[in-house]
Amino acid sequence: MWIVWKLSKGLRLSRMLQSFTLLLMLCVFAFTYFYYTTDERSDYQHYQYLTRNLHNSSVGYLVWNSKCHMLSVNPYDPSIRQFVKKETFEPCSTKPKLTTINRQANGSIHLTVDQDAAKRYVKLSCCWAAISRPTTANEFFLDMDSRISAGPCQDFKDRVVLDKKDVQVLLVTCRDGKAKVIYKNTHSVINPKRARQRLLNKSSSSSMKNKKALSVLMLGLDSVSRLNFHRTMPAACAYFAERGWIELRGYNKMGDNTFPNLMAILTGQNETTSNLRCDAKLPYTLDHCPMIWYNFRDVGYATAYAEDQAGISTFNNVKAGFMKPPTDYYLRPYILASEKLLPTRQRFNCKHCTGPELSVDRIFNAALDFSEAFVGRPSFGFFWSNSISHESMNGPSLYDARFVAKLRAMDDAGVMNDSMVVVLSDHGMRYGDIRDTFVGWYEERLPFFYIWLPEWFRRRNPDAYAALLVNQDRLTSPYDVYETLRDVLQRAGGQAPISTGCPLCSSLFKPTSMERGCRDAGISPHWCTCVGFESYNKSDPIVSEGASQFVEYVNNLTERYKTSLGLRLCSILSLKRIIRVKKLLDYDNLRPTDKVLKLFYLLELTPGGGKFEITMDYRPPGIHIIREEQVSRINLYGHDAICLDKGYKKYCQCRINIAHSILKWF
């Protein structure tokens, strides 16, 4: 009897434990749901929770060492699901293109009319005109890099042989009969003869002779984070995995926008250093920048650079651009002609279609054309697209299949056997609703980066390939990419200076230190994803003092902008609210005796509603240190800053009467 009672009691106890366990699981689920669906708790608080509870574990991190705790975040985190959607592809024209540029087997280049497409029309007549930029450099014209002119339109019927014609861009116009224009399009012409003689002369005298040089092809999509690339371009991700490309999972940007991040890649310099030699705010100083493509050209490489959206391109957005073409094949005149001389269609606040073609297609078709033209000869190509991704987090989803098709075409043409191919971005989305979440903060700082090395290079350089495999899970930065380009250049017999922006950075063909932090990689704490956050009391006087000092800092900067009568162009701003403040844990610089307190603010100012993230140092007693490179605006200023054509536009809310008088002219 006692045994039966004992068993019965044990059974009841077991059931009680099961019920308690079930109740506990329900409580945990409810807490987790609340945790993720409450605005504040769903992002920074969650991050704070992880950094505290996984303090001594590498589980859940992309990079983990004593200096860097870089979280692995779910691309479909609940806090951002509402912002994610798939965009549909829409062709720019339902009709086939009437004309194409064709490279014949013997190398001859033809402008050709598609005879099948031409059958749609009874009396088709076409002519072509050469498009060119000014041939004489003139420093007094501040828009040299945005000027184009068209030559006379020359009639043709079936084709034009372009071999002996010095033309890089042309405009085709076709009519059905004598009056009605039924087709207009622009074409870029990559004629190897333009660079061939120079390349032959260089090759015969350089140390590259008898060496197999590795070509370089860089393909960029603006404003695409690593996580967003996985969300929007799964077919491309699958292609990269299938073909054996290497993804740098710990690639962290070093600056705010496109310009500093690409300058770090192309010159190895930070903004402060590059401004000493080539301040882009001054006319044509970019011509004196030590872009690494010049070093590749000097050692015998053909060079090319192209970027769509001429008004916001890297070297022309509130900048004068280049007085002289910086590369052998400089496609800005082609993009200008496409945007100015053809009908355009807007999408994502960009010129999505120019004539019958997608703007992004023009860039990557040019990349294919250039790299294919120089298969077997060393080349350096830099091709960048803004049109589908600069203003839209979801825009790349419409291009996924087409992008894979471009990559396969390059592979079929032999480009992948010749070239180190890098597919990358500069940063994630810098504006929009997603930036109010922690995941948005995180994604902005971690752009995607994939790299391909030909089989022959892997065989000849097993240590370089092994190092690259190691580096895919370590902290890397744009300065490491510059050092990698410098490494490729040196292997071809060329030289370039080491990175001044990050003297400790090294080529990706060498293993980076396992114990590496953002300071080692040339990344400031403001942009660093190796950091952690802790709660901080908003009511602490230190917080309000810091916010007030930031407002004063902003107003002092904008005070310099005045009308001819001495009136302020920008409104005096004040603090609207402290949205968030956290204590920033910089694991690269944590010392028990350090009295410096790092605070990470999200502030909203008024008028205008500008939202700013600031990483601010506080040193007792009462010293708040604000650095310009530690401030970022996370919502668009748009026409709010229309009274300024350059300078600190992100801080300027134009005074209403001044802004209205300017807008009347648009």
Spans of features found by a protein language model:
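A long, amphipathic alpha-helix that forms part
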Residues: M16-F20, M25, S42-Q45, V73, ...
